[in-house]
Amino acid sequence: MPKRLVLALLMLLLCLSVGLASPSDVFPLSHSAHQQLSTLYLSQGLALPSTALPYTRAELTFLLSRINIEDLSLVENQIYELLAEEATREMPAFSIGSEISYETYIHSNTNDFTTEDDWVYSYQQRKPLLTVPIEISLGAVTGAIDFTLVSRNVGDADSIALLYGKRNLSSNIPYDFSTGEQYLDSNIPYRAFLASGGANWVVQVGRDRLSWGPGVSGNFVIGDQLQYHNMARLSTYKDSFKYSFLVSFFPHPNEIYDTSLPDSQARPITGLKMFMAHRFEWRLFSDRVNLVLSEGIMYQDGGGNLDLRIVNPMMLYHNYYLRSQANSLASLELDYTFQKGLNIYTQFAVDELAFGGTEWNLESGRHPNGLAIMLGGRMEKPLRNGVLRGHLEGVYTDPYLYLRSLDGNTSQSNDSADSLNYVVGLRKWYSDHIEYDQTYLGYRYGGDAIVLSTSLGYYIPNSWYIRGRFFGMLHGEKSVENPWKLDDIEPAPSGITSTYVQLGVSAGTFLGAWNVYGSFDFLSTANNADYDFDFQLVFGATYSWE
């Protein structure tokens, strides 16, 4: 059958797909469709597709409709067919899948590299031993729940069952055969939600991972490093415009830091901490430019009350003027594909901006800025049977980005609960106590950082890939635990600077239902006169069936 006829039939099937497949089926954030669609857009000379992830089947169908099927190379056509098949897949009303993975982690320095932050291959990247995804697909209503057998993210650093630690060899099996102890994470599921939607909209409520932005090393408003959001979101799109609205809930600082509360399961939920944001995306200049404006607030109430006047999907949140209860954050994103396969992008975020003659002329009590900027370029070039891909990205973040005292006008006390910031926690139960796994909501490395990252790789769809990468970072003294101080206006990196360098390569191959992969990395850290390094090796294999 001629190529054009095949592609025409595929396009017709896409047009009918919303009536066949469940339009509100939500892809996991890690699904390959997100990366493959970006590859197809850039190689065709289009700006990046929407960077508010994840997509639904209906949105994937909508985004594929922009592709000119008459102008596809052999490898582009292969990617298009894979995406079209995914977009039009009709799911049964109830389905259960399974994925079993075995991973081995080997490293050389067992004294200085014993936490998650000391590994290139992070906890979020590491696969559970077993994943059992359950999906319901009932037309306009869908749902998902993922049951996993996975090692917990804390524990005895001497155990082989821990994902990183003081042994040269560890694995993703949540059991220590030498001691008989199990390290199973009992806080699952981390993905569980209901969704409802149509051809150009979706509403999703529950737990899921999210990402807003084009960055590779991270994003400023919502980073993909957070294990899940307890959230509700709306996404709707038409022609060249997309609108998103999100509310996501986290433990209040009083709940986290109140030492009078029990550490057991009886520890009550106290207070309210809610992130609320909206996002506006425009595609301009014949689909070659994306312009995105995002604005959000972190709203807190120690009594756990929510004033419904706050919940307005179209409000200008900066104009609430609730400094003692809300901390606002705004961002601008822009990307431009200036020729086929080559794209440049930027992000700019404002958490705190001290401006005006009154502020600048103060002898004391000056507010530190909380700004962030990212500049990057991306390449997706078809080459023979595959795609040559790479990126180059630089990031600067102010020392106090994401941090602030409760009232925002006086320096933070030594009480960690005296804060209204963008450090968020996930409540978890580990054996005999409650812990709060805290990280930044936005950029994974937070403030006080200068980052340079780059990569170059080659990918053949459904066959194999290889990728080399470099990452360098200068990080100052400020972290999630630092109090916010007036008059501390030093630029990044502040104080004693830590230097991080990573250099590595990863590769993998797809063999039917099997995926075999591995990586080798060199990681070094330097702080004052201290210098440490580690060699890290990862091997893994995954078998999936539906």
Place the predicted regions along the sequence by residue.
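Bacterial N-terminal signal peptides
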Residues: 8-17
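Flexible, solvent-exposed loop segments that connect beta-strands
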Residues: 114-115, 161-175, 358, 482-493, ...
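C-terminal structured domain segments
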Residues: 498-526
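Bacterial N-terminal signal peptides that target proteins for export
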Residues: 1-7
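Outer-membrane beta-barrel channel domains
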Residues: 24-31, 43-51, 55-58, 62-290, ...
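Signature for the C-terminal beta-barrel architecture of outer-membrane proteins
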Residues: 211, 222-431, 447-454, 459, ...
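Outer-membrane beta-barrel "beta-signal"
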Residues: 432, 509-512, 517, 532-546
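Boundary at the C-terminal end of the N-terminal hydrophobic targeting segment
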Residues: 19-23
